[in-house]
Amino acid sequence: MLAQKRSFQSIAKSLGRYTSTISREIAAGSCNKYTYRANKAQARAIRNSHKRRAGRYDLDDNLRLKRYVYRKLRLKWSTTQIAKTLEKDYPTDIGMRISPESIYTYLFVLPKGTLKKELLACLRQNRKHRRKQRRGVEAKRKLEDMLSIEECPKEVEDRIIPGHWEGDLIVGKNNRSALGTLVERTTRTTILIPVKSKSATDVAKAFAREVKKLPKQMRLTMTYNQGREMASHKLFTKITGVKVYFANPRSPWERGTNENTNGLIRQYFPKGTDFTKVSRYEVKRAQHQLNGRPRKTLDYQTPYEVFDKLINS
């Protein structure tokens, strides 16, 4: 068509394309106004595609960086955690740098296969809204002798003094199994607790068993929702000496640290997990990995690092 000296408008009309599209394509593959080389345009398209895919850094060109990124992804670190920790681990090595966006870009353009599937599964599921965890009609009944969150010491809200925890249960398949979760508000240290059942007595004893292992200065308070599984809170307090305060109904933000952490835990135990089939080893491995992740809110230190500094200071 160009050889026939037809205009861009005429070519666009014949091909059912916009004139601007024809103009850009010819500009990309032309030697002059009236010659178009499809192979030249294709080669340029491939080069541009590679640049877009590679992002600022191409991990395939830096094996050491690639191994580092893969290793941390398999520990379920976020791309931001990886990028920030690289700066700490290699402060003078510019070659060991990559942005979070470049990691995402690299992963999503990997060829389809087992490796891509494995690495993408390590990324967090960024839902816009987290579903409320319903406790049923029983959750609306007030627990006997419960202390309201309004009565909490002010130091709990300030997060300056460690030893204040938030607790919850992650419910498993068919609402028949569960995993207890505890998160320390200052250090973000997480404890995962296998429970025999969701009965109040079993939950209180399981939580107490783990809390008793903590240094005394790290056992001050616990904030929980008004679920019936914590109806034996007085038994828990008797065993541990830790007072339990209860958040208001339908107010997950009052235990925001725990709610956020439950989302992270779902990376290891997705919704629908049957916790009766999850071994204690699997639970503790997930706990270890969670506490070994650098956190933005901790200036990219890990919960383990901050916890150890506080109890040894």
Where are these regions (language model features)?
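Charged alpha-helix within mobile-element recombinases
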Residues: 4, 14, 66-75, 85, ...
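Short, surface-exposed connector motifs at secondary-structure boundaries
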Residues: 6-7, 187-191, 214-219, 269
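Conserved short alpha-helical interface segments
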Residues: 17, 74-135
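Mobile genetic element proteins and their domesticated derivatives, centered on retroelements
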Residues: 22-25, 69, 82, 103, ...
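Mobile-element integrase/transposase regions
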Residues: 122-179
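Active-site beta-loop-alpha junctions of metal-dependent nucleic acid enzymes
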Residues: 171-175, 192-216
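Acidic/histidine-rich, metal-coordinating catalytic segments
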Residues: 218-231
